[in-house]
UniProtKB/Swiss-Prot annotation:
Keyword Cell inner membrane listed: no
Organism: Psychrobacter cryohalolentis (strain ATCC BAA-1226 / DSM 17306 / VKM B-2378 / K5)
UniProt-recorded name of the protein: Probable GTP-binding protein EngB
Family stated for the protein in its record: Belongs to the TRAFAC class TrmE-Era-EngA-EngB-Septin-like GTPase superfamily. EngB GTPase family.
The keyword Nucleotide-binding is annotated on this UniProt entry: yes
List of residues binding GTP: 21-28, 48-52, 67-70, 134-137, 167-169
Function recorded in the entry: Necessary for normal cell division and for the maintenance of normal septation.
Any one Gene Ontology cellular component term annotated for this protein: cytosol
InterPro entries given in the database record: G_ENGB_dom, GTP-bd, GTP-bd_ribosome_bio_YsxC, P-loop_NTPase
Length: 227
């Protein structure tokens, strides 16, 4: 893998809300709109290639917003996709500080296969999920409402109880509803002006390679100790 794994996450304390979605679902745009900052969440020039897990403090160090790597992009090698799936499942099921998941899905193509897999993992971990049907500005009002109703129907078929809303980062529509959901999970009134990027999210170059190497050594050591 070309970036740190979930084993390199900060201490599993406090409360986290994770943002997840396909590589073209508008995840970075949603985070930037929520925080009213253009470049807080950075997109890779090649969708699906960025595997960095970014953490942002929300008010204090015990409340974090987690920007998970995008998934599902066709240009990513199959083996890399498999690695990501293992890492994502481990994080969603075992991360005790994770208070909720915001899942982004393009309103024009809602709930693709891996979106539904993410929802199943969240259900296995008894994790609350709030779905954003992103890019709502791409459809007319009636079509957007139909997409919302159809997605709710699909969730019911899957036996999933998730809250869901329309969202447009471009028009900044749906921000108050999203902030309200996140505030309930954080047990805190969300103030976008206090969301700041944490230093531990900025591993690059040699520092990044060192982190990956240390993670591999720790994993090998753990496997040997278990024998």
């Amino acid at each position: 893998m070309s970036a740190p794994t979930f084993r390199l996450c900060p201490a599993d304390i406090g409360l986290e809300v994770a943002f997840a979605g396909r590589s073209n679902a508008g995840k970075s745009s949603a985070i930037n709109a929520l925080t009213n900052q253009r470049q807080l969440a950075r997109s890779s020039k090649t969708p699906g290639r960025t595997q960095m897990i970014n953490f942002f403090n929300v008010g204090d160090a015990d409340r974090r917003l987690v920007d998970l790597p995008g998934y599902g992009y066709a240009a990513v090698p199959l083996e890399m996709k498999k690695e990501w799936q293992v890492e994502l499942e481990e994080y969603l099921v075992s991360r005790s500080s994770l208070a909720g998941l915001v899942l982004m899905s393009d309103i024009r193509h809602p709930l693709k296969f891996f979106d539904e897999q993410m929802l199943r993992w969240a259900k296995d971990g008894e994790l609350p999920v709030h779905i954003l049907l992103t890019k709502a500005d791409k459809l007319k009002y009636g079509a957007s409402k139909n997409a919302l109703l159809n997605t709710r129907k699909r969730l019911k078929e899957l036996g999933l109880n998730c809250s869901i809303q329309l969202f447009s980062a471009l028009r900044k529509e749906g921000l108050d509803e999203l902030a309200g959901v996140m505030g309930n999970w954080y047990e805190y009134q969300l103030d976008a002006d206090k969301i700041i990027e944490s230093s531990f999210a900025l591993l690059e170059g040699d520092e990044l390679e060192d982190a990956i190497e240390q993670d591999a050594l720790q994993k090998d050591s753990s496997q040997q100790d278990s024998k």
